Amino acid sequence: MLTRHQKLRLADALLERYPDEVITGYVVNARIVSACLVGKVYQAWGYAQGERLVSGAITRIIQYERRWLIETTEGDCLAIVSFAPGGRRSLLHLTALFETAALAHSRWCLH
């Protein structure tokens, strides 16, 4: 069950536009576990509203002004609505790993 604050943040995220991306789901209480995005997903094909999501491996992280977008090996582009405790730290850790990988010319990238 979403709190009132989470509902407002989700509504705000649903109204935002990303001209270069097609959002396939909105994730609440997000965190990164083993290079996958975990949380409750909304407005995602094949998932019930609020169903637990474990994404495919993350291939790209995009930071917009107010929101993080996550692309996966499955072709999903997921918008993070809110973080679970420690979730932002886990994303920033993965971001640092992607930056290091870019120096080594790896296929993983950050935008």
Language-model region placement:
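N-terminal non-globular leader segments, chiefly Sec-dependent signal peptides
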Residues: 1-59, 98-111
